[in-house]
């Protein structure tokens, strides 16, 4: 599967470079396209040219790239255009070992496959407390029972209210609400001024402290916490106090936009509005794979096939922009006038 995806990616990327007839082609591009086009034409009865000049020739090359991407993804999109019929025999061209793949394409595919077969710490995009079901007002003292109470202020901040002389452990409060956190990087600070339940202003007692695994950590210092070592708080003073914990970032074994290099810009390219035709074609491809058709996913992709699909479709978007094909998609009406922000916004809604 890696070889087929790498060949498809190599061919699609090579097609981006052939639009200017005055430019000498890279020898690697000539070799890749020469063999790939010959195999593709022979198996599908198409007539793709290596140096497309006319609109019909540009269309044919783009259709070949679309066939390559669909074959590599093992997707059939059916009858979606009166001008394009998917050539199912394309997989036979990609399966031949004669078509070379370039180093970068194979490295990209192997990196995706390798990363998705294992786990490693990566920075999480959402806050650690995004899953909290309730929050409280910052700086409002509230201890309905006991001597300490912790609560969440927002997705990144937690606060601990403490009576005079109180102490306790806050591991359960500081740990993220979901996922397998590896390390959490936070700072803590006492709230200098806060208010009691009646609204009167109070000042935190001096000498409040936080220890991690028995070691005192200074307020304002960045603490790297493994979510296991005990985090204890104390208020040895004679007044009530509130401590605030702010998580700067944390790492997890969950997939993120850093799991694979260039994943974030790849997603941006995939979902960019190039034209109504491209918008519809991309949506059809992703729908067949049970992926988000119009807007990027809420959470980073977690499967190899999804990330490979994003990489191939993003490259297909580049080919679309380079070749400027002109064909129709069923149910798509060409806009009147130039594409503007209002038209694009309406397409995403």
Swiss-Prot record:
Main location per the UniProt record: virion
GO MF term list: host cell surface receptor binding; structural molecule activity
Entry GO CC: viral envelope; viral outer capsid
Residues passing through the membrane, by range: none
Biological process annotations from GO: fusion of virus membrane with host plasma membrane
Keywords assigned: Capsid protein, Glycoprotein, Outer capsid protein, Virion
Glycan attachment residues as annotated in the record: 45
Pfam families the record matches: Orbi_VP7 (PF00897)
Keyword presence, Transcription: no
Function as written in the Swiss-Prot or TrEMBL entry: Major structural core protein; binds to structural protein VP3. Constitutes the surface of the AHSV core.
Family membership noted in the UniProt record: Belongs to the orbivirus VP7 family.
Stated name of the protein: Core protein VP7
Organism field: African horse sickness virus 9
Gene that this sequence comes from: Segment-7
